Amino acid sequence: QVAGYESFSSQEYYRLAYEIAGDIIGGEYGIHKLEDYDLVWSPSGKTCSEHLFSLQTKSGDELYGTLFSSHYCGRLNAAGNIDNSLTVGCRKHWYLLFEEKDYRVDKGVLHCWIRQNSDTSWGGGSYYPNFGKWQRMVEAKEPPFDNPKVTSGWRCDEGGSEQFFAFTTKYSQQIADQTQPRTDANYPFLRYADIVLIFAEAANELNGPTKESVDALNDVRTRSNATGKELANFTDKTSLRSAILEERAMELALEGDRRWDLIRWGIYLQAMNALGGMDEANNVKQRSSKHLLFPIPTLEILTNQGINENNPGWD
């Protein structure tokens, strides 16, 4: 039970989620489905049936172009090298949740790039991760690691720099021109995959592990070439809940869901503080109860007579 919500019935809300997600899956609100992985993040798939609500953008436009894709995917110069940003990604812990064959890391993670200056200054290139298939490809100089611009070799440092994370390709695959400061990468507020996982979670919370809930989970997994889960391996509601929570972290990474998921499950502080205060790039991750809420802007407190104090811990 999340503090402050003791009067809420989680079962009531799970029942509503189960019914509404079921209606969407059943086609009551139009035809939506889990599209082929390659289509979802392609230019032609930006308005496909999987995307229920997205922020639509326009390449190179000061008003309608978006900046977030540069942080997640980097901005390219005319030579095809990263010359700006590419600083927001997922940790190695996240990457290791996946099977190597899973499209969400095989295709959904940037595996090689060249940073202007930090790489070009020594004739090198960067890659991620430094194990498994991609490490073997680096050692064998298989494409794309046969790039003639990389004359001195490839480097990967997973433990001490914001330059080496599991950077997503979700947004770079769909944009028309990655050299633009403002791109046409659409931001997905709600995808059909989220609806299916909501249905799986709600079904489990109401009825425990059933074929219905595990099938929904597996629909998301197998679309990305991941191995399906076996119903027999889930002995109780808690075990399937953990699998669904993990799947949400995998499927919806960098789509703005994770913090809210951790808060609604009541494990935000536990999860964040398990990092030991710092992540690999020395970003402070220590959190206290005040971080469960954002601070109220000072201007709002001054102008709204109904607000006489800030949220706890933000005075």
Report residues per predicted region.
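Helix-capping and short linker residues that terminate individual alpha-solenoid repeat units
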Residues: 28-31, 225-226
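C-terminal structured "cap/appendage" subdomains that terminate the fold
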Residues: 203-206, 213-279
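Extended, hydrophobic/aromatic-rich amphipathic alpha-helical segments that build helical scaffolds
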Residues: 1-25, 53, 102, 186-220, ...
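Hydrophobic alpha-helical scaffolding
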Residues: 7-10, 14, 43, 84, ...
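Elongated scaffold/linker segments in the mid-to-C-terminal portions of large proteins
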Residues: 23, 30-196, 205, 268-315
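Charged, low-complexity surface segments at secondary-structure and domain boundaries
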Residues: 4-5, 79-80, 92, 226-232
